[in-house]
């Protein structure tokens, strides 16, 4: 056998051996800015599961705009679990028969292991003096957000702005619609996802304000330094939930229901909740929520 063929054979044997090391493989289809959360969570769960069952798990991730992700699952992406940032995306899968109709009752807290809220990220010194939603709809302002139709981040921005407009004197659906329309016209572009929006604002330098999850703001501070921007908490915003579900059609086909269920249940464990808090999400565990009082 020549050297080239030997090299190919070695690579193939390595791939077979690597695959054989895992007793099962799970794919988690998740929203864009959850990369860091599950990068930390997966090794933690693998260690727990190995100690409990003796099984080795291979855990894979797929990330993107929440609505794009569920459409990919509906189109054949074989995700064992979905971990999203808006309930209507999981309802979409339930309507397709991929997720149980009562998915929100399968786990505690309506199947949302942690929460967050929406904040404004502005340049150092807040040069345009942004304080609340009305400032962002003013002429000449550029806002950076992901597309409201494709992402939970963008949709929660839309809903928070709508809710704020309704609370104003004389507020009604018509005035809220007009206000949100003005706000969205101030977006020079719609980012593909939450992390893309962060890159657009922080690295490309586009826009006057980035609207994003509170948790993403903390990740920006970690990566870019707190001195390079400021965080503004508007007077009213939506509590963002992050629902999870098992993709029944996939786990039944692969025989991974036991592992997939445990993977999601562990999000509510002390370790899982601590990981959420370490990634700047608001845990459901009241003791941990108190511990991380900066929320």
What are these model-predicted stretches?
Residues 250-295:
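Extracellular/periplasmic juxtamembrane helices and adjacent flexible linkers that interface
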Residues 168-235:
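Ligand-binding pocket segment of bilobal, Venus flytrap-like solute-binding proteins
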Residues 7-19:
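Bacterial N-terminal signal peptides
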Residues 29-31, 122-124, 142-169, 183-187, ...:
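Short beta-strand->loop
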Residues 125-131, 150, 163-171, 250-258:
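Short helix-loop capping/hinge motifs at secondary-structure junctions, enriched
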Residues 42-51, 74-78, 87, 94-98, ...:
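Sec-exported extracytoplasmic/periplasmic mature domains
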Residues 112-116, 177-184, 191-192, 224-257, ...:
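Periplasmic-binding protein-like
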Residues 23-151, 289-294:
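N-terminal segment of the mature folded domain
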């Amino acid at each position: 056998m020549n050297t080239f063929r030997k090299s190919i054979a070695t690579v193939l044997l390595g791939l077979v051996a690597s695959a054989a090391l895992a007793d099962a493989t799970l794919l988690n289809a998740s929203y864009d800015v959850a990369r860091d959360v599950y990068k930390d969570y997966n090794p933690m769960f693998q260690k727990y599961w190995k100690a409990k069952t003796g099984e080795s798990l291979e855990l894979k991730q797929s990330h993107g705009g929440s609505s794009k992700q569920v459409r990919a699952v509906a189109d054949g992406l074989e995700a064992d679990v979905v971990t999203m940032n808006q309930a209507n995306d999981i309802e979409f899968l339930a309507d397709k028969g991929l997720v149980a109709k009562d998915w929100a009752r399968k786990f505690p807290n309506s199947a949302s292991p942690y929460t967050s809220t929406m904040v404004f990220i502005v340049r150092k010194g807040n040069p345009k003096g942004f304080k609340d939603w009305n400032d962002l709809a003013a002429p000449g302002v550029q806002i950076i957000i992901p597309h409201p139709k494709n992402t939970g981040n963008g949709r929660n921005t839309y809903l928070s702005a709508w809710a704020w407009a309704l609370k104003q004197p004389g507020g009604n659906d018509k005035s809220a619609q007009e206000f949100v329309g003005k706000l969205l016209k101030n977006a020079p572009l719609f980012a593909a996802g939450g992390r893309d929006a962060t890159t657009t604002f922080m690295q490309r330098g586009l826009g006057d304000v980035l609207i994003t999850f509170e948790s993403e703001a903390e990740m920006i501070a970690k990566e870019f330094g707190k001195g390079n921007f400021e965080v503004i908490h508007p007077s009213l915003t939506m509590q963002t939930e992050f629902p999870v579900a098992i993709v029944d059609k996939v786990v039944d086909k692969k025989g991974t229901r036991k592992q997939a269920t445990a993977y999601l249940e562990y999000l509510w464990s002390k370790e899982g909740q601590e990981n959420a808090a370490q990634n700047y999400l608001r845990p459901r565990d009241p003791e941990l929520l108190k511990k991380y009082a900066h929320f």
